């Protein structure tokens, strides 16, 4: 469900792990990217026809790549038709909605799996070792990506639909930080707007400075600094959707509770 930018990563992962995509849904009818992966996939632009096609079929997984504010309802759909669900980040925009999804999981006996691909990066173990041996308690995460004026007019620029940069850009970074440094956090200071977020968190005994910027015209920066050591988050983090699918196919993926800490943190920062 959803054939935007991130969908191709899922198409590639489905192909690499031996899967077959039988149906897709997007408001656009120009989805030529399917030709490179699943040319026989039935494409729909209307949810009702997509629903009718999927109902009663033996579908193993529903993949959710729609705009953030629709993730929860599309996860409900996937569970309702009797499939597991693979959902892009963020699973929800409000922590309370996680509990509703858990209830639906229990009723249907199917699972929701989350794409938390940064946890699977080749560099993660090296970062973890640095955390354990460093004499410094200072950490800085800088993430800069350029987004043109189109961003403000798309659903991504609408905070009600995307959750703002905290959920749309920052969620996978916050998840990685909590995965590495610990799930308990405290907000020391925070400020931001629809294109810039900046502040300091206290996580696992470390003062973690964070700067998220999607308004800059400079080259992208994806850097995590621990003391004097820098880690480029652009390297060692490739083909991770396929790795995520491999874990999901063996029931070793990341479930609903895995995303709760980062969802709670982003929601708290948004309301700070």
What are these regions, as identified by a protein language model?
Residues 10, 38-102:
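Beta-loop-alpha module in the N-terminal Rossmann-like domain of NAD(P)-dependent dehydrogenases
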């Amino acid at each position: 469900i959803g054939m935007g930018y991130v969908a191709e990563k899922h198409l590639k992962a489905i192909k690499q792990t031996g899967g077959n995509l039988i149906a897709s849904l997007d408001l656009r009818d120009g989805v030529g990217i399917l030709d490179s992966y699943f040319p026989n996939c039935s494409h729909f632009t209307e949810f009702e026809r997509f629903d009718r096609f999927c109902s009663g079929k033996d579908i193993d997984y529903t993949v959710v790549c729609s705009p953030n504010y629709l993730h929860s309802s599309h996860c409900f759909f996937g569970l309702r038709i009797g499939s597991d669900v693979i959902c892009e980040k963020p699973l929800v925009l409000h922590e309370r909605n996680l509990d509703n999804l858990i209830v639906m999981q229990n009723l249907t006996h199917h699972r929701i799996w989350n794409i938390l691909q940064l946890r699977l990066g080749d560099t993660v173990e090296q970062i973890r070792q640095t955390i354990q041996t460093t004499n410094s308690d200072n950490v800085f995460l800088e993430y800069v990506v350029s987004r043109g004026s189109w961003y403000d007019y798309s659903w991504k620029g609408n905070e009600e639909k995307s959750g703002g940069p905290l959920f749309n850009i920052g969620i996978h970074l916050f998840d990685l930080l909590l995965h590495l440094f610990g799930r308990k956090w405290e907000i020391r200071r925070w400020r931001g707007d629809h294109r810039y977020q900046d502040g300091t968190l206290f996580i696992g005994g470390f003062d973690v400075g964070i700067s998220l910027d999607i308004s800059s015209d400079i080259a992208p920066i994806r850097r995590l600094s621990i003391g004097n050591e820098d880690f480029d988050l652009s390297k060692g983090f490739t083909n991770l959707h396929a790795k995520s699918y491999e874990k999901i196919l063996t029931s070793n993926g990341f479930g609903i509770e895995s995303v709760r800490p980062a969802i709670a943190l982003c929601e708290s920062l948004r309301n700070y």
